[in-house]
Amino acid sequence: MAKQQTSPETRSVRLLKVGEQVRHILSELLARQEVHDDVLSAHTVSVTEVRMSPDLRHATVFIKALLGEDEDLVLKALRTNTAFFQREVAQRLRLKYAARLKFLADESFDVASKIETLLADPKVQRDLRDQESDG
């Protein structure tokens, strides 16, 4: 029997959908404190994004420790408990393969904050006003 071909659009939608499901599962596990770790119990952790590899075997999980406290410590605790998270995700999703999770700090908030600071700078504001009056 021939293998069914999927279009790139279908594949990308599936990656997004599975990534979002993984994000919800991990968020729920952390919110309910189902992992028994003192560091994770003491911190509020937000799972901001999950990016799946095209074969769904690897998931990069971006997290943000709320209030920016001890993010390195939280990442270390998450990495220590990776096996627990992988097992829970595999049991709840029932995919062909259990995705290997890789936890990283989400730095997009820091980048956005820097951009906002730059845009609030008086010199930049002046340049923006000059461009509007020229256009």
Swiss-Prot record:
The family assignment reads: Belongs to the RbfA family.
Role of this protein = One of several proteins that assist in the late maturation steps of the functional core of the 30S ribosomal subunit. Associates with free 30S ribosomal subunits (but not with 30S subunits that are part of 70S ribosomes or polysomes). Required for efficient processing of 16S rRNA. May interact with the 5'-terminal helix region of 16S rRNA.
Describe its assembly.
Monomer. Binds 30S ribosomal subunits, but not 50S ribosomal subunits or 70S ribosomes.
Annotated GO biological process: maturation of SSU-rRNA
Q: What is the lineage of its organism?
A: Bacteria, Pseudomonadati, Pseudomonadota, Alphaproteobacteria, Sphingomonadales
Output a single Gene Ontology CC term carried by this record.
cytosol
* Subcellular location(s) of the protein: Cytoplasm
PANTHER family reported in the protein's UniProt record: RIBOSOME-BINDING FACTOR A, CHLOROPLASTIC-RELATED
Q: Does the keyword Ribonucleoprotein apply?
A: no
**UniProt-recorded name of the protein:** Ribosome-binding factor A
